[in-house]
Amino acid sequence: MVGRPVEPGALLQGQTVTVPITALAAGGDGIARLTDGRVLFVAGAVPGDTVEARLVHLKKDHGFGKILQIVQASPHRIEAPCPVAERCGSCQWQWIDYPFQLEAKQRQVREALEHLGGFAEPPVEPVIAQPRPFGYRNKSTFPIGRDARGEPVIGYYQKDSHRIVPLDACPVQDSRLDPLLAAARELIRTQGWSIYDEKHHRGALRHLGLRIGERTGQRLLTFVVNGQTLSGIKPAAQALMDRFADLVGVCLNTHTERGNTIFGPQTRCLAGQDFIEEVLDGFRFRIEPTTFFQICTSQAEILARLVARGADATAEQTVVDAYCGIGTLSLPLARAARAVVGIESHVRSVEQARQNARINGIENCRFLAGTVEALLPDLRADIVVVDPPRKGCDPEVLEAILHAVPMRVVYVSCNPATLARDLKRLVAGGYCLVGVQPVDLFAQTHHVECVATLERS
């Protein structure tokens, strides 16, 4: 069978092109335009760069390129402080100066609202910057594997792969976690524990989890295993506790299923306690190994205050906090509201939320286990706060909100695309978008958090 003849000048996969980078895509890649009109996505490229790139994959209307060399560097390009930044898949923007990162994130939110939400002039404020663009992460989870020599390695996955890039330290995480990373790696090497092989679903150690209270300094270390016991793990855990003064606990999480989920359903404490405490907006929260808590405490505090300001609750009003987690938004909301009702499908988070309310002496909060669409119709909801996962709200949740007819909705989102989609539905249902405030919780990455406020028309 004879293939279709290639037109003169046609671009082919594997070909090298020199292109100017004009923008950043929502996923963090640089964007260029090929001579045939197709969009080219180039990982690691910065607007203002001119790069020589290999066409590694071509589709009908777009393609993907790999940088071979930077012909001319953008004025926004800087030297990445991390020695493995170009290989590690955790950070996409370490080589972009921070002010330009913030501009790009604001543009990303605005364009999502315009193109996906249909808002002509969306009221998007400048992004609230992180005071420390490095060393801000209060949580890290590292896959554990073996290198080509069979030695244990701990690090992050290389972009678009499951090859582990070994790390001695991570400049994005709180530097107080770096010694724990080094100690865990040495412990795994000396103990000779078996390492999980995801291809054959064999071996014990899968992940290492680290947490720290930014304000309290308390640290927690968790080994994730594939259901197998680790010889000598309890005395090893106690030795870690004795070595590090602020290490309050060492835990073992069991995860026996295949797949990319990091933690399994069972966690037990090997030494010390199974939680750290953190202070946010004047409240004290207990955080366990698998608890969801924003990865930058100082920015999470700003987020909580923005939500409370957007809700603008009075002593006569009830606020429903949908997807409430452990109550990090509920408790600050309770200062002004008559009552706050938190809804959360994860039962352990509901138990923790109730515990956090008790610890802080909050009596006008109650927490319900279940789905928003099932529970909201039976509740008084003068104001609704939603903080869904990246996929956004299910259609049934949006319909439940509209049927509750709250006077105000505050929507917290980590995904501008699903935020735009859901705001479009709420506005069509009778609400007016008052404002969108992006907050940078994820410096050196393309991710951005937003707080959107809507009022009933």
Curated annotation (Swiss-Prot):
Residues recorded as binding S-adenosyl-L-methionine, renumbered to this chain, are Q294, Y323, E344, D387
Q: Where is the active site?
A: C414 (nucleophile)
Q: Which UniProt keywords apply?
A: 4Fe-4S, Iron, Iron-sulfur, Metal-binding, Methyltransferase, S-adenosyl-L-methionine, Transferase
PROSITE patterns of this UniProt entry?
SAM_MT_RNA_M5U (PS51687), TRAM (PS50926), TRMA_1 (PS01230)
InterPro entries referenced in this protein's UniProt entry, alphabetically: MeTrfase_TrmA_AS (IPR030390), NA-bd_OB-fold (IPR012340), SAM-dependent_MTases_sf (IPR029063), TRAM_dom (IPR002792), U5_MeTrfase_fam (IPR010280)
Instruction: State its Enzyme Commission number(s).
Output: 2.1.1.-
For whether the record's keyword set contains S-adenosyl-L-methionine, the answer is yes
Do you know which Gene3D superfamilies this protein is assigned to? 2.40.50.1070, Nucleic acid-binding proteins, Vaccinia Virus protein VP39
| Stretches assigned to the TRAM domain | 10-69
Q: Where does [4Fe-4S] cluster bind?
A: C82, C88, C91, C170
Task: Name one process (GO BP) from the record.
Answer: rRNA base methylation
Pfam families attached to this UniProt entry: TRAM, tRNA_U5-meth_tr
GO molecular function terms noted in the UniProt entry? 4 iron, 4 sulfur cluster binding; metal ion binding; rRNA (uridine-C5-)-methyltransferase activity
Origin superkingdom: Bacteria
What the record says about family reads: Belongs to the class I-like SAM-binding methyltransferase superfamily. RNA M5U methyltransferase family.
Q: Which PANTHER family match?
A: RNA M5U METHYLTRANSFERASE (PTHR11061), TRNA (URACIL(54)-C(5))-METHYLTRANSFERASE (PTHR11061:SF30)
Entry protein name: Uncharacterized RNA methyltransferase gll3134
